[in-house]
Amino acid sequence: MTISPPEREEKKARVIVDKDPVPTSFEKWAQPGHFDRTLARGPKTTTWIWNLHALAHDFDTHTSDLEDISRKIFAAHFGHLAVVTIWLSGMIFHGAKFSNYEAWLSDPLNVRPSAQVVWPIVGQDILNGDVGGGFHGIQITSGLFQVWRGWGITNSFQLYCTAIGGLVLAGLFLFAGWFHYHKRAPKLEWFQNVESMLNHHLQVLLGCGSLGWAGHLIHVSAPINKLMDAGVAVKDIPLPHEFILNKSLLIDLFPGFAAGLTPFFTLNWGQYADFLTFKGGLNPVTGGLWMTDIAHHHLAIAVVFIIAGHQYRTNWGIGHSIKEILENHKGPFTGEGHKGLYENLTTSWHAQLATNLAFLGSLTIIIAHHMYAMPPYPYLATDYATQLCIFTHHIWIGGFLIVGGAAHAAIFMVRDYDPVVNQNNVLDRVIRHRDAIISHLNWVCIFLGFHSFGLYIHNDTMRALGRPQDMFSDTAIQLQPVFAQWVQNLHTLAPGGTAPNALEPVSYAFGGGVLAVGGKVAMMPIALGTADFLIHHIHAFTIHVTVLILLKGVLFARSSRLIPDKANLGFRFPCDGPGRGGTCQVSGWDHVFLGLFWMYNSLSIVIFHFSWKMQSDVWGTVDAAGNVSHITGGNFAQSAITINGWLRDFLWAQASQVINSYGSALSAYGLMFLGAHFVWAFSLMFLFSGRGYWQELIESIVWAHNKLKVAPAIQPRALSITQGRAVGVAHYLLGGIATTWAFFHAHILSVG
């Protein structure tokens, strides 16, 4: 027998898929609960439907085979992408069929976006307000019109094509999801090959994706937007493909195209400076970032990511190995350092998801701030309603993602954490000194809470006593945010030093002039004062409490002094059995539950701060002499320094539009405001409640049914403690978010 040398063995192509692993069976899918042996037997009690929902997507409970779990998650991703593309297609279809997009394009300063017309059933057509240009419909605040203009879409036919393209894409995604689970399913080794994955994600998805987008921006968006900015009628603008096929059209707008690719290969890149610009600031016509700056940015990002994708060792013996990087990463005080983290992240999808959600959530909140400080789309900056809505949207989405990160970190700790792998590494060391971490964090929360709230209480008291000279304010005892002001000045001065070719600062929010578009403020310096200093410390307080709850849930998910064997009880359990009082509501799930309330609490204050600050100090009109009149007349600095000011001059004053909306086009928001308060109050019935009360009530109702011989075959059961809390928090958040939605919309659509 001949023994091949190892290097010849390695060169064989590896088979990394299984063929036809799982049959496609509609009969199986039609059976409710087919994924769980107990559930598949059908319902005995009403708890069955709850467990069906709780476990349908909990792949860990379907099988313990990591390969099968990985395949299910992979297939589910394609399903998710299909749902997203169908949803987007629907939005774009509405834009094509029911909207005033073309009228808005011709006059974006005076026509407001609308993509929904209500049918005249029992008088509901009152909701179709006059949005300008003779169109009546519901004003939308999703920013889609601004995005489409940025893409270079000039008519509804292009929107129809895009909508159909979205559906085709959804079909491809659905097919891919089915194909990669039922026909050619990747093996576990493929899912765990992190270097190839980084290679693909960085280089192909992010790198080539950005490069393709830069191409679209250069060849389609930039020329079309340049013509629209110059006031060329939409019907006279060439169609997107004409710019690509007819080079002379591009050369007329950007002479740099005349030289072709020669400057690229001769490294004479300056010739492309007319369409790859570095202007900084905002386009004075649209109030958005310069399209050519955005193209330049995406080209640079593409280069960075394509290079980054080449860093990792795959089939050739060069490049980084993630395992080696992690295992060599040891500090003087961190024991085994990052050893073991590679195994955690390649065998636990929860660990992977937890880190990704935490990063993505933080990034989403950063995006919320970029959308107003550096509005990327044309005419977004002057559409105040849209600005407020997309800020609020991104803030809340980010909050949910961060709480989800903590949830999956706790699930990782309970289900996937292996103490043998994590010996004296950074994770083990953090868990071992968790008492110090949590007690310090607790102290910080108490300190921040008392001091930040105390400043407000002091001001309320002094104002009530008629002693304004003793208040913390810009006109009495000043507490200026000096570090924030320093950062603002630094950024205003930076373009001359760090980016010598930039013509304007990165964002007028930091400093510079007032940019007005059509007599409305697009952006101007946001001056910070004592009121911002006070509310900033409330933000610090609420964020730290949220972190305290979530981090405690993760660090004590496996064990605590109270329940040393917590890991055996699972991610969610109501109490540690009978006879152990005081062990309720300590599971990982319960910490996520509590964290959600504080996340909502934190972010409500963030969006209130933003809404009032922008209306008071940024948004408004500019007259011919250059004088700015803000929506609420700059009242933030003196009113936002007391609790009473927040209640009276923000909540109550700005609720007048939603409260008085009946009989107007905004009346739906009045009903929503009422209905959402009701949903919120309904949540309290589940949150301030005991399971026994409901079970007792159900028993007597069942007795009455038995008396009348109409007893159901499926036994009614009261919600478990955990189910009741889940229903409670869901309605609390839904009610709170929809109330805020109605409050913000009715006000800003009236005054913005």
Swiss-Prot record:
The keyword Protease does not apply. Its EC number is 1.97.1.12. [4Fe-4S] cluster binds at residues 575, 584. Chlorophyll a binds at residues 685, 693. One of its GO terms (cellular component) is plasma membrane-derived thylakoid membrane. The chain crosses the membrane at residues 73-96, 159-182, 198-222, 294-312, 349-372, 388-414, 436-458, 533-551, 591-612, 666-688, 726-746. It holds the Pfam family PsaA_PsaB. SUPFAM superfamilies: Photosystem I subunits PsaA/PsaB. Phylloquinone binds at residue 694. One of its GO terms (molecular function) is 4 iron, 4 sulfur cluster binding. It is found in: Cellular thylakoid membrane. It is a multi-pass membrane protein. Chlorophyll a' binds at residue 677. Its main location: membrane. It catalyses: reduced [plastocyanin] + hnu + oxidized [2Fe-2S]-[ferredoxin] = oxidized [plastocyanin] + reduced [2Fe-2S]-[ferredoxin]. It is an enzyme of class 1 (oxidoreductase). Keywords: 4Fe-4S, Chlorophyll, Chromophore, Electron transport, Iron, Iron-sulfur, Magnesium, Membrane, Metal-binding, Oxidoreductase, Photosynthesis, Photosystem I, Thylakoid, Transmembrane, Transmembrane helix, Transport. The PsaA/B heterodimer binds the P700 chlorophyll special pair and subsequent electron acceptors. PSI consists of a core antenna complex that captures photons, and an electron transfer chain that converts photonic excitation into a charge separation. The cyanobacterial PSI reaction center is composed of one copy each of PsaA,B,C,D,E,F,I,J,K,L,M and X, and forms trimeric complexes. NCBIfam families: psaA. PsaA and PsaB bind P700, the primary electron donor of photosystem I (PSI), as well as the electron acceptors A0, A1 and FX. PSI is a plastocyanin/cytochrome c6-ferredoxin oxidoreductase, converting photonic excitation into a charge separation, which transfers an electron from the donor P700 chlorophyll pair to the spectroscopically characterized acceptors A0, A1, FX, FA and FB in turn. Oxidized P700 is reduced on the lumenal side of the thylakoid membrane by plastocyanin or cytochrome c6. This is Photosystem I P700 chlorophyll a apoprotein A1. The gene is psaA.
